[in-house]
Amino acid sequence: MVSQSTVRQDSPVEPWEGISDHSGIIDGSPRLLNTDHPPCQLDIRLMRHKAVWINPQDVQQQPQDLQSQVPAAGNSGTHFVTDAASPSGPSPSCLGDSLAETTLSEDTTDSVGSASPHGSSEKSSSFSLSSTEVHMVRPGYSHRVSLPTSPGILATSPYPETDSAFFEPSHLTSAADEGAVQVSRRTISSNSFSPEVFVLPVDVEKENAHFYVADMIISAMEKMKCNILSQQQTESWSKEVSGLLGSDQPDSEMTFDTNIKQESGSSTSSYSGYEGCAVLQVSPVTETRTYHDVKEICKCDVDEFVILELGDFNDITETCSCSCSSSKSVTYEPDFNSAELLAKELYRVFQKCWILSVVNSQLAGSLSAAGSIVVNEECVRKDFESSMNVVQEIKFKSRIRGTEDWAPPRFQIIFNIHPPLKRDLVVAAQNFFCAGCGTPVEPKFVKRLRYCEYLGKYFCDCCHSYAESCIPARILMMWDFKKYYVSNFSKQLLDSIWHQPIFNLLSIGQSLYAKAKELDRVKEIQEQLFHIKKLLKTCRFANSALKEFEQVPGHLTDELHLFSLEDLVRIKKGLLAPLLKDILKASLAHVAGCELCQGKGFICEFCQNTTVIFPFQTATCRRCSACRACFHKQCFQSSECPRCARITARRKLLESVASAAT
């Protein structure tokens, strides 16, 4: 690719150092100076090899002078021809691959060739090149010479005068009669690295995915802090903009147009289309706009500030009308601590920033072309909505949990027993990955994997240390308390839920009461304690009796059929039933001797017996499901409950009185 860029003729160029008078032919190459040739533009081709030029430290570099001859510098198409040869003599195959060329016009030549004939030791700061080689060819000639100017060469040169940031010729001579220019460099090029060395393996990207997420979160948090501080100046800026809208609008538009035109002529670098090559456009470097410059430029806009709120995905088009966003703020949601929600909201905010940058670039293009400030909001909205399916993006393209082929196990409670399957089938279902860390496993090493009874998957020896634990599914389905080998992840999960009451036998394993007699006995005691505890809470003299309930977890006496793994193991060992019986005995003794508790009992209305009965007497008492009254089991008839009959008669009486009054 060949690109041209012009420089102002009056641009200051400092003299180059090391000027001497010398002319001649180097390495037997013919002299390229032709005084009869008509003046034409100078062609300077910048060529860079795709490999990095590295100078070994142990190799003694031999200096070799490079000659070039030019006529007197002028403004009418002066030609600049340089002869250069690499000391190490790189092969043509190394210099011929993937080269980028840049043609400098006569103005550029005039600026470069205006060196002082007397010489100077100052460094040139107005002309810098970063390509590996500079090939300068005079139009009409087939000879091409190379000048190594790679920053890598400059950086590894053992000589202190070499600068790694700028291209600085060692010697430059402008003869009065011939205008010869001599350039000398000391370089040794070695193409010792292949391009594959600089390519990261896929495994590294997979393993470091959490680093990318951490960087995104840290970047978002730091941006939030900055935005909170910038919000304090929002009010003053808005007042300033509103005051200048009426008076300075024409000046603002003129300033905006001028800055955009200056930006178009700035020094930029673009991709040349060839591997490892870049095209440099040599032009005056324009000053980068600061935050306050952008604010002054955008005085003519109506919407000055852009507010990006987490969770407010539908209001993104309201901010698209702003051409240059000057302030962004992020607000918090109540459930901001959720990791999945945080990732989704971060993705939304980054997409909003992306769409705003697209709008700004479209606005700048429209201003430079037609001078209008018109943004097609509807088009931007459609494009944004079509490319912003957050759920699909996170699920398929940017999965946080592992990769598309593997995902780490989830923190979940499994209530089913895994059927026995062949090892090869299970590992094949895992895509030959370790279920814990995602390490690929070759088929010949499948036998070394270890099976986890809780998850029903195979793990490597790093993720499975032969830890043993009870399986909840086997306890609830088969009343099996044997310990089985589980993975490290499963062991940690089961230990974390060991004391948590999350197993409701009424909904999970109701048939378990018939299989386990000790569990059925605990169920009966638990029902009595459930009712008597309610009665004791209403008595102001039952403090000593209520303290007895502190010996067991609260869920055993507050709710029915609710157990933890620890409770089930204690029931199996026979440790929980005696403790519950002692608590029940102390509670019954208090109720029998307390007048307040006796006054809250029931009298059986069927037999009219004066003995007080209570709901916790499950052996002799039965409660009506409708009115919750207590009766003797042998006396109770659900179809003829006296209390329910009285309630029905009272309701009918009230309805009849209300109808008669109307």
From Swiss-Prot:
The Gene Ontology terms for molecular function here are: phosphatidylinositol phosphate binding; phosphatidylinositol-3-phosphate binding; phosphatidylinositol-4-phosphate binding; phosphatidylinositol-5-phosphate binding
Question: Which keywords annotate this record?
Answer: Acetylation, Autophagy, Cytoplasmic vesicle, Lipid metabolism, Lipid-binding, Membrane, Phosphoprotein
Q: Which residues carry this modification: N6-acetyllysine?
A: 483, 523, 533, 573, 633
Protein induction: Up-regulated by epigenetic drugs, such as azacitidine, and artificial transcription factors (ATFs)-induced treatments in cervical carcinoma cell lines.
Instruction: Map out region (Disordered) in residue numbers.
Output: 1-34, 58-131
Please list the tissues where expression of this protein has been recorded. Answer: Expressed weakly in cervical carcinoma cell lines.
Quaternary organization:
Interacts with UVRAG; the interaction is direct and promotes association with the PI3K/PI3KC3 and HOPS complexes. Interacts with STX17.
Protein name (record): Protein associated with UVRAG as autophagy enhancer
Originating organism: Homo sapiens
Q: What is the lineage of its organism?
A: Eukaryota, Metazoa, Chordata, Craniata, Vertebrata
